[in-house]
């Protein structure tokens, strides 16, 4: 609080006191006293402020002079330090420059010495090269002279040889070339024989390993199917009931099933004979149901035959599903599964086609695994390779082509379709899976006991083998042995030599392969 304010407040307090003590003072006196006090307070305040400001200004000026003096002294000190540092830096730079200059002079001198040494070495090499060139030129001239002498000598000897032999050089060359051609031809034939024999041995060894391993892991226990089936009867009296009055029961059963019922003197047995296994199976089931039921008459026979047909259809579907389950082949179309089931009632040379297809699927998958391939496609193609046999009595054409068309219709992959079509050579192989399926098919078919062959067909096959062998020029005699698995040929030595016999064997093998269908390897 300033002095004027204190005086003003003191005056107010004084007046208030006076007013309380003497109420008789008038208002004018109060106002005049207040103004006087206020003027005095303002003047005193102004005087005090002026003295205080002057003191502050004086102090500030003194501080400013001190600061300026300090700054001048500090600037002078900094200036001296900067001059000293600059002198030191100049001295250091001068030393560095002198050192670097000295190093560069030394390096230049070293390079100059190396250049001088290289120039001296190059001069020496140049002198040596000049000497070598002179020596080579001299030797070249000597060789040219010797070459000229040799050519002259060769010409004289050639003329002397032509005179003595009575042949020109061209005639002699032709004779020599002819001899060389014969020798090269013979050596080429022997080399081809050696290479091909070695390649066949290696291929046969590897193929035997793969097929042996596959066969060892795939043991089939089924036997050849027959075209007849024997139904056991509880007693011989049942034969008369099956025949019926005037033979109407047996005629009805034969008409509805298409199967021949043979009732002879065989005790307690009826023979069902039919080439269609599906019809034979329908007749068997129907007859067994009739025997169990005991009521045998045309109406009942018709009813049982219908039930048997439905049961066979169910069995066909179940057999197809079981085949896919056994071989782990999934995702087949329902129609393909049904066709697979129908193969159970088809045979090929007495071999059950469904069992054969399962066996081929196993073998193809195992061989694919041995080759480091994914066995899935090989097993799928092997299972479906004979699918055409389930429909080939309805559609004309080879069963391989029919099967390929069926597989294609039900969206099988191109690899599977080609494997089916090519497994009998009707189309070219487009994949390794197709080759494996053909090999597995041949293994399954050639397995001992898998298929039957009639005596007449066997004899004709042996005669055809010997006929093909005897048709070649130079063959004296031929023998088909080992059940037609080996063909031994005796040739005339004056007509066929060793190399020619090898070529004859190759051509004969191709002829047999083209003209005969073989399930085994022929030696």
Swiss-Prot record:
Membrane topology field: Single-pass membrane protein
Presence of the UniProt keyword Calcium in the record: no
Q: What is its main location?
A: membrane
Keyword vocabulary terms for this entry: Cell membrane, Endonuclease, Hydrolase, Membrane, Nuclease, RNA-binding, Transmembrane, Transmembrane helix
Residue stretches making up the KH domain: 227-312
Q: Name one Pfam family in it.
A: KH_1
GO molecular function per UniProt: RNA binding; RNA endonuclease activity
InterPro entries the UniProt entry points to: HD/PDEase_dom, HD_domain, HDIG_dom, KH_dom, KH_dom_type_1, KH_dom_type_1_sf, Ribonuclease_Y, RNase_Y_N
All copies of the HD domain together span 353-446
**Which residue spans traverse the membrane?**
28-48
Q: According to its UniProt record, where is this protein located?
A: Cell membrane
| Gene Ontology process terms (BP) | mRNA catabolic process
Keyword Transmembrane helix among record annotations: yes
Protein EC: 3.1.-.-
Q: State what this protein does.
A: Endoribonuclease that initiates mRNA decay.
The family this protein is said to belong to: Belongs to the RNase Y family.
Name the UniProt record assigns to this protein: Ribonuclease Y
């Amino acid at each position: 609080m300033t002095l004027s304010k204190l005086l003003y407040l003191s005056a107010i307090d004084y007046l208030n006191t006076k007013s309380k003590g003497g109420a008789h003072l008038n208002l004018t006196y109060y106002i005049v006293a207040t103004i006087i006090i206020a003027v005095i307070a303002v003047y005193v305040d102004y005087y005090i402020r002026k003295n205080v400001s002057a003191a502050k200004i004086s102090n500030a000026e003194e501080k400013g002079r001190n600061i300026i003096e300090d700054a001048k002294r500090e600037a002078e000190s900094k200036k001296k330090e900067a001059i000293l540092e600059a002198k030191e830096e100049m001295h250091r730079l001068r030393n560095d420059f002198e050192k670097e200059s000295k190093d560069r002079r030394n390096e230049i001198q070293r390079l100059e010495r190396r250049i001088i040494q290289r120039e001296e070495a190059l001069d020496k090499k140049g002198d040596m090269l000049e000497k070598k060139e002179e020596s080579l030129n001299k030797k070249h001239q000597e060789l040219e002279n010797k070459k000229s002498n040799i050519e002259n000598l060769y010409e004289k000897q050639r003329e002397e040889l032509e005179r003595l032999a009575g042949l020109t050089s061209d005639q002699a060359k032709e004779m020599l070339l002819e001899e060389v051609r014969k020798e090269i031809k013979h050596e080429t034939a022997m080399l081809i024989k050696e290479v091909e024999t070695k390649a066949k041995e290696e291929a046969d060894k590897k193929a035997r390993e793969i097929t042996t391993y596959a066969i060892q892991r795939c043991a089939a226990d089924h036997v050849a199917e027959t075209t007849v089936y024997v139904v056991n009867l509880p007693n011989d009296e049942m034969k008369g009931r099956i025949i019926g009055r005037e033979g109407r029961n047996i005629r009805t059963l034969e008409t509805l099933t298409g199967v021949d019922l043979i009732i002879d003197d065989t005790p307690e047995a009826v023979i069902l004979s039919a080439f269609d296994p599906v019809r034979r199976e329908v007749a068997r089931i129907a007859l067994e149901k009739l025997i169990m039921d005991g009521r045998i008459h045309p109406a009942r026979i018709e009813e049982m035959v219908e039930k048997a047909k439905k049961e066979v259809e169910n069995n066909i579907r179940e057999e197809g599903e079981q085949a896919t389950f056994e071989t782990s082949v999934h995702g087949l179309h329902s129609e393909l599964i049904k066709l697979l089931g129908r193969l159970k009632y088809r045979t090929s040379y007495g071999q059950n086609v469904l069992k054969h297809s399962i066996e081929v699927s196993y073998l193809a998958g195992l061989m694919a695994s041995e080759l480091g391939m994914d066995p899935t496609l090989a097993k799928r193609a092997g299972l479906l390779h004979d699918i055409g046999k389930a429909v080939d009595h309805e559609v004309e054409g080879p069963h391989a082509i029919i099967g390929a068309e069926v597989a294609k219709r039900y969206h099988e992959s191109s690899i599977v379709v080609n494997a089916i079509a090519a497994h009998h050579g009707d189309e070219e192989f487009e994949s390794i899976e197709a080759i494996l399926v053909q090999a597995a098919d041949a293994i399954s078919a050639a397995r001992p006991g898998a298929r039957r062959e009639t005596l007449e067909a066997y004899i004709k096959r042996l005669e055809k083998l010997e006929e093909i062998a005897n048709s070649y020029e130079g063959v004296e005699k031929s023998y088909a042995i080992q059940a037609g698995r080996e063909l031994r040929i005796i040739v005339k030595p004056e007509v066929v030599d060793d190399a020619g016999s090898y070529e004859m064997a190759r051509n004969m093998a191709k002829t047999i392969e083209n003209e005969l269908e073989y399930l085994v390897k022929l030696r």
